[in-house]
């Protein structure tokens, strides 16, 4: 299959989460088109990403349409193996094997030949959400309020609900205590074994 390289540079700014980063990557890969292709992430920006951060990105391969998304093995990978209790002999074996097979990555690694290369400076990633209907429709958090208001009356489609102005004033009475309207936030337990939105990176939880 075609292999698309995705070069990561820089580092995320404080307060920007792995989810924000992943939504930006999904947006870029959807725009480029990676259906039926592999995506390999590389670049000096990898060093700033923990293994859970990388897993968050790889886990979203169905959302950006690729057959798979993966990261080469590096020192962070080995550190995670040690953290998870692997024996040093096992860690050394993984390193030796990956170096021999060309799966190892560090700052001295030559760039491979890819079908195409995309590039993202992680310092440019902004806090964001996606939707209202598709994960690749990323919206900066600073624009979310206006985007939400416009999506209510926009024609039905990927980013619209087709409501009339009169619909916006309608509300739903829940029991005898709560009056819900468009835009109200309701907290519910919606769980999944694998979705990004219910399986955040530890970085997201800590922040």
Give the location of each predicted region.
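Mobile "lid/hinge" segments at catalytic clefts and subdomain interfaces of large enzymes
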Residues: 1-90, 194
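Active-site lining segments that contact anionic ligands and/or coordinate catalytic metals
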Residues: 3, 36, 115-117, 136, ...
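Generic recognition of flexible, low-complexity loop/linker segments
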Residues: 27-29, 46, 105-109, 117, ...
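Terminal amphipathic helices with adjacent charged low-complexity linkers/tails
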Residues: 49-55, 62-153, 157
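Non-catalytic terminal/interface segments that mediate subunit docking, oligomerization
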Residues: 123-199
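Single conserved hydrophobic/aromatic residue that forms the stacking wall/gate
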Residues: 197-207
